[in-house]
């Protein structure tokens, strides 16, 4: 992330795996939406679900990756930094609501048991950052 003057603050705590799939997002949002590029034909067919005020980006990325898998298309990792962003956006400002909504998104895509298990891991992982 960067500050208001564009100076580097820190890297994201999550990193993109070499082989990304929609299942990868069980670990958290591994690619920020600012750096997530989708083919236009797929992106046009998958609008943001506006019932989510804070986690529509997570849901959209997962649905795009599911569609990519369904069409047997590759997901390509671009090496290097493709987007810088400032801390303090919508998710940060609405942290509690964002966490609840992200749980709902994960439950929708991965099921309740997996989502609960991963959230226990998120809590444990937070102590080691």
Predicted regions and their residues:
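Conserved donor NDP-sugar-binding/catalytic core segment of glycosyltransferases
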Residues: 1-10
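C-terminal, non-catalytic tails of nucleotide-sugar-dependent glycosyltransferases
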Residues: 7, 70-74, 97-129
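Conserved nucleotide-sugar donor-binding catalytic segment
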Residues: 9-98, 105
